[in-house]
Structure formats: structure tokens, C-alpha cells
A protein has these predicted regions:
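Hydrophobic ligand-binding cavity/cleft-lining segments
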Residues: 5-71
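Extracytoplasmic/periplasmic/luminal assembly and interaction segments
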Residues: 53-104
Length: 168
């Protein structure tokens, strides 16, 4: 077998693989809803203060390398989460201290988008925080990666772990 023929076989195999992944992604739903919950060792006021103060995220969210706080628009907090080379514009769309906070991805050019709804309930010795992600994944290949590699709830689980560590 010549090098050219071997190269063509490799390229054809990769093309078929990409086509299969894209086909599977097109069969997966664009939208999803995922929920995670945790009991945290702080009262609802302290938990709400931590999740609503996006300017302090970089100090305790180890998954972020920086947070760029932007000027509010229509009274809504806006910021950019920076993680390595990735930048995700965010905004708060609903704020009801200390019970509920809703944030959303504010960049329509990303292959994904959606909201996180934080619901806080007082509990014995702390707060029960529930995060509900209502997401959409526009790119079929990214749907496959999100569903089968990362999992829809991975970022929420990381957030809850970081918040728990921050609150002590």
C-alpha cells in the first residue's frame, strides 16, 4: 500500500466518523433541562450574596481564570467568564434576594446557550441550593460531545463544589 493510498483511507475514515457524529447529533434534541442540588453550610442570605456577586467569582471559582465585570444594561448585571482562552458573556435576568437568581449566556454566536435558575431554600443548618439549567446546543457535533463526553450537569456540579468550598 502506498503512502498516498494510506493517507486517503485515513482521510475517508475521518470524514465518515465526522458524518456519523454529526448525524447522531442531529438526532439528539437541541434543548435540554438538567438540575443539580446541594446543601450548603450557610444561610440563604450568605449563599445568595456569593452567587450574585459575580465580581468575586474569580476568587473562589477555580474553574475560571478571570471574570470581567461589564457595565449593567437596564439594571442587569453583566460579565464575562474567562476560562483559559474561552470567554462567555453572561447576564443576570432575574434577581429575587435571597430566594431566586436567573442568569443567562448572553452571546448568541456560541454553539450553546441557555439559563441557570438558582433557587435557594433555608434548611436545617444551611441552605438547599438547586440549579436548573435550561440549555440549547445549536451545533450537532457539540450536542454529541456535551451529551456523551462532558455531560449536561458537569458545569453545575463544578460550580456547587466550588461554592461549597468557598462557604466552608
Amino acid at each position: 500500500m502506498t503512502i498516498v493510498r494510506a493517507g486517503l483511507i485515513v482521510l475517508a475514515t475521518l470524514a465518515v466518523l465526522v458524518a456519523v457524529v454529526a448525524g447522531v447529533g442531529m438526532m439528539l434534541p437541541r434543548d435540554h433541562v438538567e438540575t443539580r442540588s446541594a446543601k450548603l453550610p450557610a444561610d440563604p442570605d450568605a449563599v445568595f450574596a456569593a452567587i450574585a456577586d459575580v465580581g468575586s467569582y474569580a476568587a473562589w471559582r477555580t474553574s475560571l481564570s478571570a471574570v470581567e465585570v461589564l457595565a449593567p444594561v437596564n439594571g442587569r448585571a453583566r460579565w464575562v467568564d474567562v476560562s483559559g482562552g474561552d470567554r462567555i458573556a453572561m447576564e443576570q435576568v432575574e434577581r429575587q434576594p435571597p430566594r431566586r437568581l436567573v442568569t443567562r449566556i448572553a452571546d448568541p454566536d456560541l454553539p450553546f446557550g441557555g439559563t441557570w435558575t438558582f433557587e435557594l431554600a433555608p434548611g436545617e443548618g444551611g441552605t438547599r441550593l438547586t440549579i436548573t439549567e435550561r440549555g440549547e446546543i445549536r451545533n450537532p457535533i457539540f450536542r454529541v460531545v456535551s451529551r456523551f463526553v462532558f455531560g449536561y450537569g458537569a458545569t453545575m456540579e463544578t460550580f456547587l463544589d466550588e461554592l461549597r468550598a468557598h462557604l466552608g
